[in-house]
């Protein structure tokens, strides 16, 4: 089941989310916006099982990686005007 995975620019490039993902949905790509010069990317969202281990592993105060389960995404879209 595919879920929506969003990477925010608060990512510090620590790779914790990438290492926590059991289905290799995430990978690091070059980015000049942080000291680590890399940011998480989610090129394989079709493999996301919605376990949210990436969210749990994120050390930032504002989660830099968020998984929106299919039901959450649908509900949010239904409320948009």
Swiss-Prot record:
The keyword Electron transport applies. It comes from the Eukaryota. Gene3D superfamilies: 3.30.70.20. Its main location: plastid. It holds the Pfam family Fer4_7. [4Fe-4S] cluster 1 binds at residues 11, 14, 17, 58. Apoprotein for the two 4Fe-4S centers FA and FB of photosystem I (PSI); essential for photochemical activity. FB is the terminal electron acceptor of PSI, donating electrons to ferredoxin. The C-terminus interacts with PsaA/B/D and helps assemble the protein into the PSI complex. Required for binding of PsaD and PsaE to PSI. PSI is a plastocyanin-ferredoxin oxidoreductase, converting photonic excitation into a charge separation, which transfers an electron from the donor P700 chlorophyll pair to the spectroscopically characterized acceptors A0, A1, FX, FA and FB in turn. This is Photosystem I iron-sulfur center. The gene is psaC.
């Amino acid at each position: 089941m595919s879920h929506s995975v969003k990477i925010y620019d608060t990512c510090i490039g620590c790779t914790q989310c990438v290492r926590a993902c059991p289905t290799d949905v995430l990978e690091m790509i070059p980015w000049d916006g942080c000291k680590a010069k890399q940011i998480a990317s989610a090129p394989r969202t079709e493999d996301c099982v919605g376990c949210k281990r990436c969210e749990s592993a994120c050390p930032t105060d504002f989660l830099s990686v968020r998984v929106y389960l299919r039901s959450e995404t649908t509900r949010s879209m239904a409320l948009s005007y």
